[in-house]
A protein has these predicted regions:
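Compact beta-sheet-dominated domain cores in extracellular/mature segments
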Residues: 17-19, 24-27, 43, 49-60, ...
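Short, ordered beta-strand-loop transition motifs
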Residues: 28-34, 78-85
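Cationic, beta-structured binding surfaces that engage anionic biopolymers and membranes
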Residues: 65-73, 87
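Acidic/polar N-terminal loop/beta-strand segments that form early-domain functional surfaces
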Residues: 40
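Fungal secretory targeting signals
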Residues: 1-19
Length: 235
């Protein structure tokens, strides 16, 4: 389980009272497989935060269930949220190929002093500090990548990211090296470019929202990228 920002230690007893989110939080929605809500902190203000459901849920032959890195979005569609109940059409092994399934997200997701957090791997004993980066209204970000030269007008590869990832590269069976990139629509990701496909090199460049619509020329060729949310996120 990952949580953004610096963690602040709290005693488990102080967090035990969290019961859910649907009755006390507002502006609850599902955006690109992220659960987003604005929740009271208990101190008179509120925090907008998110949980990446694709890393929390799985489809088991047409039934939604809890699973770390379950990637339910690969085989479920037409998902809707009613209160805390997520309903989807998910693939099954026999005909018809999809069936309706629902899951109560409050089984493992609750408001902890303003933050939506999942407790499916254990009791919550720490919560993150509040990020200054707003939760995006659109989680998709695009990198148009050039493989030769330094002109972003000649990009030949388009990489779309909307999932947190420690390391990602386009695997076509041959090594692809990028010389420049044009980023668009980054509303809060930290995207780090690396010289190798394992993302073990020193960072070559770190993209933020400030780099939108600007051509970035790498000082050495790049092969892979990591993507980390900078907003309030449990992923």
């Amino acid at each position: 389980m990952h949580r953004s920002s610096v963690l602040l230690g709290l005693c488990s007893a102080a967090l035990a009272a969290a019961q859910g989110f649907s009755t006390e939080c507002s502006d609850i929605s599902i955006i690109d497989y992220w659960l987003v809500a604005t929740c009271p902190t208990g101190s008179g203000d509120s925090i907008t935060s998110s949980v990446f459901l694709n890393a929390k849920l799985a489809n088991s032959n047409g039934n939604l269930g809890w699973a770390e890195d379950g990637y339910y979005a690969r085989s479920c569609q037409d998902c809707t949220l009613d209160g805390a109940t997520l309903s989807c059409e998910c693939e099954i092994a026999s005909l018809p190929s999809y069936q309706s399934t629902s899951l109560n997200l409050e089984e493992h997701i609750a408001n902890y002093e303003g933050h939506l957090l999942s407790n499916q791997t254990g009791a919550i004993t720490t919560i993150p500090s509040d990020s200054t980066v707003a939760v995006p209204s659109d989680f998709d970000v695009t990198l148009a990548l050039a493989t030769t030269g330094t002109a972003c007008e000649r990009t030949g590869v388009s990489l779309g990211l909307n999932n947190p990832t420690d390391c990602y590269y386009i695997n076509l069976g041959v090594t692809i090296e990028y010389t420049a990139a044009l980023q668009t629509d980054n509303q809060g990701w930290e995207i780090v470019a690396y010289a190798d496909t394992e993302c073990t090199s020193d960072p070559i460049y770190t993209f933020s929202s400030d780099d939108n619509d600007s051509c970035v020329v790498f000082n050495e060729t790049v092969q892979a990228f990591s993507a980390t949310p900078l907003w309030n996120a449990d992923y």
